Amino acid sequence: MGLGQLSAAPLPRSFFDRPSHEVAPDLLGRVLVHGPVAVRLTEVEAYGGPGEDPAAHTYRGRTPRNAVMFGPPGHLYVYFTYGMHFCANLVCLPEGHGSAVLVRAGEIVAGLDDARARRTPAAGRRARLPDRDLARGPARLAVALGLLREHNGLDAIWEGSPAALRPLTGNLGNPGDPGRSGHGPEHATWLTGQGPQHATWLTGLPHGSAAVLEGRPADPDTIRSGPRTGVSTAKETPWRFWIDGDPTVSPYRAHVPRRRSSAATSVGETPSS
């Protein structure tokens, strides 16, 4: 499936101004864009706020590390875990609530070559990765999208005219220099790694920005829910949501106790700070 088959209409901030366990299933089938890569979300997990969800980073209150989760809805909360991985969340509820949805897996619908180039070194092997594995799991998804510590707090809501945010295809110029004469449309993000002759530009989205697009919402009959992956508390809370039968969904793994520093907490572990 390509981006051209999906709606490029941006989701409004009000979409995220709800409890995370309501937002999470509605995110399935939506498209998260960052830079040249776009991912159709197929698996997510909801995390609640302070005093509500023992598995959430915000359970014990606000800290410098989780401060973005207490900010406005629709921003990216990106954190480092296990000393090696980044994971990305979308903040929910009004400012001050400390709730978010972890984006766990998805299908690359634009920027496949860029995603593959980012993932291959991380995979530590020369064999070609199957397309389904490029964003299969939260750390892999963050790598594919190029999300790092500096993107923590990035706004993923497009505030401009929805009509201005649309894909264009064809020979539109050099993807490395958008916005200049002869080099593609102004204020656009180049979304493929196949060269300008076959490029897709998402017009209206400044280069390097993020956005959540309408995509194609998952059929409710295909949505499944169950316990969250790897959490040691609130183990039975069914706030992991996925599209049944989609090959990009990551396998479920129960929590396995391990010794690690407090700085290397997993998605489902409450940080000690």
Residues of each region from the PLM?
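Conserved, well-structured core segments that form or line functional sites
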Residues: 2-179, 183-273
